[in-house]
Regions:
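Alpha-to-beta junction loops
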Residues: 1-2, 92, 175-177
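Extracytoplasmic/secreted envelope proteins and their assembly/folding machinery
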Residues: 7-10, 14-17, 59, 75, ...
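Short helix-initiation/N-cap motifs at beta->coil->alpha
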Residues: 73-77, 161-175
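Extracytoplasmic/periplasmic solute-binding protein
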Residues: 44-48, 53, 79-132
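Aromatic-glycine-rich donor-binding/catalytic loop that engages nucleotide-sugar donors
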Residues: 60-71, 155-156
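Short, solvent-exposed loop/beta-turn-alpha elements that line the ligand-binding surface or hinge
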Residues: 19-29, 71, 97, 101-104, ...
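Glycine-centered hinge/linker elements that transmit conformational signals in sensory
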Residues: 82-83, 128-163
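Hinge/lid segment of periplasmic solute-binding proteins
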Residues: 3-53, 109, 115
Length: 177
């Protein structure tokens, strides 16, 4: 068994993938939405996990800062809450966001997962089904806005982006910081 997780993976490794059509494992799937098929329609990879996009929230800390999830309904309300929490981080004992960084252990959060959001919507709107040579950047302003919000309202200063690590972020979240 090996992972073939996207259309490019199927192009690269499709010759090694068996046709799973009609197999017991495929019959156990509750949705076919995440399966990968080749040009003939043969199922070559099944969706065994699903990564969703969003912000992981410590609801207890959010409440300690005086907010409920229902208070945050769009980017403007997220920004207002994050900036308020960041301004009071010293008194609260935690910051709006865990450390933001671009070292090898954490850059995937921002250069991969976060970047997937504007790309998903651009590709959806443009009907893109394969890796394009270029992007239009239709949603990059949204990416910049959330990236700026993260780096300006986290426990690591924007000047420490090259040294803040994923381990720091995980430790902060895990210890309620």
């Amino acid at each position: 068994l090996f992972q073939c997780g996207n259309a490019q993976g199927l192009l690269d490794w499709g010759d090694y993938c068996l046709d799973l059509t009609g197999t017991d494992v495929l019959g156990e799937m509750t949705t076919s939405d995440f399966n990968l098929t080749d040009e003939t329609g043969a199922v070559k990879a099944i969706g065994y996990c699903y990564e969703a996009f969003g912000i992981i929230v410590n609801k207890a800390l959010l409440a300690k800062a005086g907010y409920e999830l229902s208070d945050i309904t769009n980017f403007a309300t997220l920004k207002a809450a994050a900036e308020d929490i960041h301004a009071r981080a010293g008194d609260l004992g935690f910051d709006a966001f865990a450390s933001s960084g671009l070292d090898g252990s954490s850059s995937w959060r921002f250069s991969g997962h976060l970047a997937n959001m504007p790309l998903y919507y651009e590709f959806r709107d443009d009907g893109v089904t394969e890796q394009p040579e270029t992007i239009t950047g239709a949603y990059l302003d949204n990416y910049r806005a959330i990236w700026d919000l993260y780096i300006n309202n986290s426990s690591a200063s924007p000047t420490s982006l090259t040294t803040a690590t994923g381990d720091m972020s995980q430790a902060e979240f895990g210890t309620g910081k």
